[in-house]
Amino acid sequence: MIREAQRSELPAILELWLESTTWGHPFIKANYWRDCIPLVRDAYLANAQNWVWEEDGKLLGFVSIMEGRFLAAMFVAPKAVRRGIGKALMQYVQQRHPHLMLEVYQKNQPAINFYQAQGFHIVDCAWQDETQLPTWIMSWPVVQTL
């Protein structure tokens, strides 16, 4: 079931984020993600609209939107991957936001494939100084240029 996250759930969401991001980014050292906890907690989760997927009292996924259009986070617990939770969360936010942008590591092909299956298109590239890795900027729906 998808519902809006409560502020009191931010620690549980942060725990789910750390588990999922470490699992989903094996090309980045786990200590990098642990070092990011204060930033994710204080700058992202605290300032985003957050929705969670809850099942039997457990949080199995979440999505965070910042500034009404930036998909800042989208994670599903590793044990719950490929059950349709990510797709349901994405459709939920797509129904509420007419335009979404996100940034994804170019090495994260499973995530890129997922986003493309949800209608996102690569529109630009960027560089992450902290990880020294390239990223794709993706947009939904596709941005038309003249």
Curated annotation (Swiss-Prot):
InterPro entries: Acyl_CoA_acyltransferase (IPR016181), GNAT_dom (IPR000182). Its EC number is 2.3.1.-. Disulfide bonds: none annotated. It catalyses: L-lysyl-[protein] + acetyl-CoA = N(6)-acetyl-L-lysyl-[protein] + CoA + H(+). Changing Y115A: Loss of activity. Unable to inhibit motility. The keyword Acyltransferase applies. CDD domains: NAT_SF. It is an enzyme of class 2 (transferase). Residues 1-143 form the N-acetyltransferase domain. The keyword Lipid biosynthesis does not apply. Belongs to the acetyltransferase family. N-epsilon-lysine acetyltransferase that catalyzes acetylation of a large number of proteins. Overexpression inhibits motility. This is Peptidyl-lysine N-acetyltransferase YiaC. It comes from Escherichia coli (strain K12). The gene is yiaC.
